[in-house]
Each structure stands twice: as C-alpha cells, then as structure tokens.
A protein has these predicted regions:
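Catalytic cores of soluble metabolic enzymes centered on carboxylation/carboxyl-transfer
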Residues: 3-165
Length: 165
C-alpha cells in the first residue's frame, strides 16, 4: 500500500472510514543514565527479560553487549488498551516486569513519567520533563525502589520461584 500511495494512487479508504480502536502508549527503553543528562551507557546486559502481554520490539538476550557506537535505544515497549488509562496501567506494569540488569537504563525514569500525576491526568506537554524534574529524577526514591525490587526478588527466590534463576 505504501508504494501505491507513493506512486500517487489514492488510499483504499477515506478519513471518514478510519475507526479509532482504543489507545496505545509506547516508551523507548534506552541504555542511558537519565540522572546524567541521558548520557548513553555501554556494557553487557547481564540479565534481560521482556514483559509479557505487551508488544516489545528488541533484539536483546542476557549477555547482549551494548556498544557505544550505535543509538542507545535498546527496546520499544508498547501497550494498547480500550482507554488511555488502561494502556497506561498496562505499560506501568510491563515496565515493572521488565528485567534489564547490568546496564544503566532509563527504565526508572520512564516509570516515574508514566506514574506522574501530570501525565496520568493527560496534561503532559513538551515542557513536562523540565517542569517536573525534581520528582522525575528523585535519587532517594530510586534507591528505595531498587531495594524493594531486590527484596521482592530474593523473597521469590527463597520461595522456590525459578523465574529469577
């Protein structure tokens, strides 16, 4: 179809025939340190697990070497829901289920953006990051979140859950 349109042929349907079907939200997981002006990171992705039930575009596996010579984006994670809020909640859950260990990523930053009241209310603009930097880059909250994640992982491992082994 793209080739036909590029050749000047009309689309097979009109704008009035386009039907909206829910909401989609995409985040781009990058090997970047958000606290250091999104400085690209390189190294080995020691452990990788993509979230289930979401569209994830990636070419990663545990042990992937992230070189400094290419774009820092390592995965696109996309949710789709009947409403914007459903899509947002699915994406928040999916980011929480994403395991990207051994390399600094913007995963925590993305989670904070999706959970921020301004984003939740639909009021985010192109000034969102600059206007909300204090809460989006809160290092103490990040340490607490990582400690909670590690504690949960250790608890699951002690209960015999092999998903983390």
């Amino acid at each position: 179809m793209q080739l036909r349109v590029a050749s000047g042929e009309p689309l097979s349907l009109t704008q009035n025939e386009v039907a909206f079907n829910g909401h989609a939200i995409e985040v781009r997981l990058c090997a970047e340190d958000a606290r250091l002006s999104f400085m690209p990171q390189s190294g080995t992705l020691a452990r990788w697990r993509a979230p289930e039930n979401l569209r994830v575009e990636h070419a990663l596996y545990s042990g992937t070497e992230i070189a400094p010579y290419y774009d820092s984006m390592i995965a696109k994670i996309i949710s789709h829901g009947a409403t914007r809020e459903e899509a947002r909640r699915m994406l928040v859950g999916g980011l929480g289920d994403t395991v990207a260990l051994g390399l600094t990523t913007n995963q925590t930053f993305l989670s904070r953006c999706l959970a921020h009241p301004v984003f939740v209310s639909g009021g985010a603009t192109t000034a969102f990051i600059a206007d909300n930097s204090a809460s989006l880059f809160d290092i103490d909250a990040e340490i607490e979140a990582r400690a909670s994640a590690i504690a949960a992982m250790l608890l699951r491992m002690s209960a015999g859950d092999c998903a983390f082994n």
